């Protein structure tokens, strides 16, 4: 006769595995533990640097801020790297820094506030931004001399709150943002009805067509995008949308989550601005509908680069 053995008691290592795993220290690769030398040894060489960043950043400020990071892990060295790489003299004033997320502007306020003041002048941190997108308030600008004005363009960047900005966002964030943008842009109608072109799936024929229309250029990736990290995983989740008239264009996941542009030949800047105001409102309205039915937070007017 076979006798059944009593069931073995579960080993304690298995029984309490889930508790032990919670008590284990975090893997070194997961925690933010930057191995750095002293501030003097890590401070960049700014002797001939002409950027605004170089005029603001001091060794004392670097000592105070270099160990800080936003919750997503963006550091002061990440912020200043584009300016460190862009050290040669330029006739154009270059800011020389980027923000990795909205929190960058508060965590590194000691750096950003004087930098914004240097670039824009009369900047006051406690002053609220007031937007005036009523084209009726624009006086004149309907017939600028076309001997001097070939093209008029109005452009702005928009980012979705709680997503990292392009210098720091992950592949998953970028893909979620592209999906959000496509849903909103494809819902536009009237003069804003148009087509989204994914750069990843762009055929040679489509590339030539968009280049001929002035929407694409040969050098889509700028030095700033390379040094800041904006070009990571290019062209994954990047694309451009344009209306049928090709005078209202939206870039997705380039320098900002969205870069919205109204453009046309000639000197009627008021017409361009009117289209920009109306189109921007429509895009944001459609985005808010997508946000309402999805899990996306609200839009912000902060941008990744000043």
Q: Language-model segments: what does each one mean?
A:
Residues 2-305:
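Long, Pro/Ser/Thr-rich low-complexity/intrinsically disordered regulatory tracts in eukaryotic proteins
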């Amino acid at each position: 006769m076979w006798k059944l053995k009593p069931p073995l008691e579960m080993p304690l290592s298995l029984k309490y595995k889930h508790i032990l795993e919670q008590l284990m220290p975090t893997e070194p690769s997961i925690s933010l533990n930057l191995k750095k030398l002293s501030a003097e040894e890590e401070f960049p060489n700014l002797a001939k640097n002409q950027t605004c960043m170089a005029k603001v950043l001091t060794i004392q400020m670097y000592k105070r801020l270099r160990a800080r990071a936003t919750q997503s892990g963006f550091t002061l060295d990440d912020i200043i790297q584009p300016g460190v790489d862009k050290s040669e003299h330029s006739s154009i004033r270059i800011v020389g820094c980027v923000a990795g997320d909205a929190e960058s502007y508060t965590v590194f306020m000691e750096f950003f506030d004087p930098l914004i003041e240097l670039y824009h002048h009369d900047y006051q941190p406690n002053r609220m931004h007031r937007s005036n997108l009523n084209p009726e308030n624009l006086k004149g600008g309907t017939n600028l001399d076309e001997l001097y004005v070939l093209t008029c363009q109005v452009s702005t960047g928009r980012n979705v709150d709680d997503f990292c900005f392009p210098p720091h966002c992950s592949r998953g964030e970028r893909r979620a943002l592209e999906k959000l943008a496509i849903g909103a842009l494809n819902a536009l109608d009237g003069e804003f009805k148009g087509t989204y072109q994914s750069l990843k799936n762009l055929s040679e024929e489509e590339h030539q067509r968009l280049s001929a229309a002035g929407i694409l250029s040969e050098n889509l990736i700028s030095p700033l995008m390379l040094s800041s990290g904006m070009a990571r995983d290019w062209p994954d989740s990047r694309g451009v949308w344009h209306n049928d008239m090709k005078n209202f264009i939206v870039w997705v996941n380039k320098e900002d989550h969205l870069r919205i542009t109204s453009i046309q030949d000639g000197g009627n800047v008021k017409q361009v601005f009117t289209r920009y105001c109306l189109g921007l409102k429509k895009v944001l309205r459609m985005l808010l509908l997508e946000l309402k039915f999805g899990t996306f937070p609200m839009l912000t007017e902060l941008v990744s680069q000043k």
